[in-house]
């Protein structure tokens, strides 16, 4: 017997919707804070107890809700942010579906007090999505929402939550991204009474970066910006010497919304190409503005993923912007000093940079107050000492800008010796330099081969003894399809019997006496990839050839050899890292050396 089709109750529908919208406490925080942002808030307090499982309180000074709309706000698909289908394709707000409040209320105890500031406020309480009480409230402009006993009626959901530190980490990550996306809003976040994040809302993105990642990282960041007919990009990129083991420090923000987009992450990594070691990732915050018509945010329940109609163009703009920003800088990292010396130096730097006229004992630390400040709905909060630290933070000043028109990105260095036949020691008026000789020549060779491969020269060297290569049938078929692409990197395959190719010539710039080895490795590189990209094949080939043709460690060099290597390195377009992202050169300034030997105190 066929089962009858019935319409689900609103309570059950809301629970189903909550399964997509409210996955964990961080989802509640995200939705409620985004509502506060859409309401025009300038100050938002987030108070969390037990990673949100006990209580989540959001207080804002936004526009508030009219008394007659309070109950309506908890109906599914009730929203003030869009009115018709056309609005759906030009979304300017973070929320627009009208699902968050009813979904959250359906799986928790929720209390809300709100007012527009013009009349008395309204207070409403719900349990499991049902209104328990609605009455008059305070007239303070803004909204306060308290969510407790989350998932009380869906115990299965509780079983899938992680540990408290993990759930707290998820909340912190969400708020960090929101703060980066909205530097003009003051976010004050505390957990069990302990402040975890505090931004002053003055619109300075660099100060938000300092509040989240630390002052030392903010001081290593440089402004980046680019613009085209469709996109406007601004933000901060941290120098390659400061990097991380995962992509979590990459923040891409589109029209005020933090999003995850693999293509944009790849574009950012391309901008840092050869500047980062393998397996390391940059710290970067990009704010991207575009017409809402070319971005679809209605493709993911949590709106974390978007669909871009001009994704490739945006990616190219980002990559080029990052490359140009770093190409202007002198990216020589400073040598590490002893931990004790570092602590002394750090203390002195803070004293000089931020509080020059005050004794060291008065220097405050970020978020040193034991509890979060009492909520003040005013737009103008009283200045705090930690705000002063951020406001007076000096910008990063690259040495390269002192000689803006100079084509040489590293100074003239004079070799004074070699250590373990691996590292070159050199000096000039700026201090001591240590150069990895293999990495230095690898960078030089890489740029040479990259240029040669890109030219696709037809000047060929005939082989006295042609090379015959045999392959399994599947590899033979793949190579047959990709012969044209292989020719663009200097591999000219001719069919030679069953499952075999013959190579009769190679470009004249191939490394002498290593021609066959190079040809085989290029072919192996092409076969190892699921699909052959000519750009990647050229890049990988240049890296491979530069590594094999460069001097190795334990190779003694004469003074003339070292001078020639350093002079050639100065002519490289990116002389600071090898193609794999390892540093080529490290500097110890004269001042640092004098501090080590206590010549200055």
From Swiss-Prot:
The record's section on SMART domains has: DNA_mis_repair, MutL_C
Q: Which UniProt keywords apply?
A: DNA damage, DNA repair
InterPro entries tied to this protein? DNA_mismatch_repair_CS, DNA_mismatch_repair_MutL, DNA_mismatch_S5_2-like, HATPase_C_sf, MutL/Mlh/PMS, MutL/Mlh/Pms-like, MutL_C, MutL_C_dimsub
Query: SUPFAM superfamilies annotated for this entry?
Result: ATPase domain of HSP90 chaperone/DNA topoisomerase II/histidine kinase (SSF55874), DNA mismatch repair protein MutL (SSF118116), Ribosomal protein S5 domain 2-like (SSF54211)
Q: Which Pfam families match?
A: DNA_mis_repair, HATPase_c_3, MutL_C
Q: Which GO terms describe its biological process?
A: mismatch repair
The source's superkingdom equals Bacteria
Q: Which GO terms describe its cellular component?
A: mismatch repair complex
| Coiled-coil residue windows | none
GO MF, one term, reads: ATP binding
Q: Which family does it belong to?
A: Belongs to the DNA mismatch repair MutL/HexB family.
Q: What does this protein do?
A: This protein is involved in the repair of mismatches in DNA. It is required for dam-dependent methyl-directed DNA mismatch repair. May act as a 'molecular matchmaker', a protein that promotes the formation of a stable complex between two or more DNA-binding proteins in an ATP-dependent manner without itself being part of a final effector complex.
Protein name listed in UniProt = DNA mismatch repair protein MutL
> Which species is this UniProt entry from?
Listeria monocytogenes serovar 1/2a (strain ATCC BAA-679 / EGD-e)
């Amino acid at each position: 017997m066929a089962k009858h089709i019935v319409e689900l109750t609103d309570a059950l529908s809301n629970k189903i919707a909550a399964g997509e919208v409210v996955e964990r406490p961080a989802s509640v925080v995200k939705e409620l804070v985004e509502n506060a942002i859409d309401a025009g808030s300038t100050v938002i307090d987030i108070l969390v107890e037990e990673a949100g499982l006990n209580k989540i309180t959001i207080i804002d000074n936004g526009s508030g809700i009219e008394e007659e709309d309070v109950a309506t706000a908890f109906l599914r698909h009730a929203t003030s942010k869009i009115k018709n289908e056309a609005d759906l394709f030009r979304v300017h707000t973070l929320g627009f579906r009208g699902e968050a409040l009813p979904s959250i209320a359906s799986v928790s105890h929720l209390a809300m007090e709100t007012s527009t500031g013009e009349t008395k406020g309204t207070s409403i309480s719900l349990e499991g999505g049902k209104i328990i009480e609605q009455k008059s409230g305070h007239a303070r402009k803004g909204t306060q929402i308290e969510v407790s006993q989350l998932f009380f009626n869906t115990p299965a959901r509780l079983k899938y939550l992680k540990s408290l530190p993990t759930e707290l980490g998820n909340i912190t990550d969400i708020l960090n991204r929101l703060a980066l996306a909205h530097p003009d809003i003051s976010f004050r976040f505390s957990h069990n009474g302990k402040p975890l994040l505090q931004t002053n809302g003055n619109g300075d993105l660099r100060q938000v970066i300092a509040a989240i990642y630390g002052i030392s990282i903010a001081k290593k960041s440089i402004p980046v910006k680019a613009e085209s007919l469709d996109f406007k990009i601004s933000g901060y990129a941290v120098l390659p010497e400061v990097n991380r083991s995962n992509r979590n420090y990459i923040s891409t923000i589109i029209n005020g919304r933090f999003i995850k987009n693999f293509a944009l992450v790849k574009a950012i990594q391309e901008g840092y190409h050869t500047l980062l070691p393998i397996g390391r990732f940059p710290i970067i915050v990009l704010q991207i503005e575009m017409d809402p018509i070319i971005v679809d945010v209605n493709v993911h329940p949590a709106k974390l993923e978007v669909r871009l109609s001009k994704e490739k163009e945006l990616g190219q703009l980002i990559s080029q912007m990052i490359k140009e920003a770093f190409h202007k800088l002198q990216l020589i990292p400073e040598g590490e000093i002893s931990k004790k010396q570092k602590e002394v130096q750090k203390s002195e730097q803070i004293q000089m940079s931020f509080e020059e006229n005050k004794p060291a004992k008065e220097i405050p630390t970020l978020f040193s107050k034991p509890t979060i400040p009492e909520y003040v709905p005013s737009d103008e909060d009283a200045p705090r000492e930690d705000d002063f630290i951020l406001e007076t933070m000096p910008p990063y000043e690259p040495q390269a800008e002192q000689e803006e028109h100079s084509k040489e990105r590293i100074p003239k260095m004079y070799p004074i010796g070699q250590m373990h036949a691996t590292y070159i020691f050199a000096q000039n008026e700026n201090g001591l330099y240590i150069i990895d000789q293999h990495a230095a020549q690898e960078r030089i060779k890489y740029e040479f081969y990259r240029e040669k491969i890109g030219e696709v020269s037809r000047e060929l060297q005939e082989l006295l003894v042609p090379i015959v290569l045999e392959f399994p049938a599947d590899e033979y078929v793949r190579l047959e399809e990709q012969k044209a692409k292989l020719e663009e990197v200097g591999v000219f395959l001719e069919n030679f019997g069953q499952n075999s190719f013959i190579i009769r010539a190679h470009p004249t710039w191939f490394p002498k006496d290593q021609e066959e080895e190079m040809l085989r490795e290029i072919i192996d590189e092409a076969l190892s990839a699921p699909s052959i990209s000519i750009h990647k094949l050229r890049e990988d080939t240049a890296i491979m050839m530069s590594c094999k043709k460069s001097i190795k460690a334990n190779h003694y060099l004469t003074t003339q050899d070292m001078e020639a290597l350093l002079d050639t390195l100065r002519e490289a377009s990116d002389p600071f890292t090898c193609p794999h992202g390892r540093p080529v050169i490290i500097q110890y300034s004269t001042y640092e050396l004098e501090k080590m030997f206590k010549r200055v105190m």
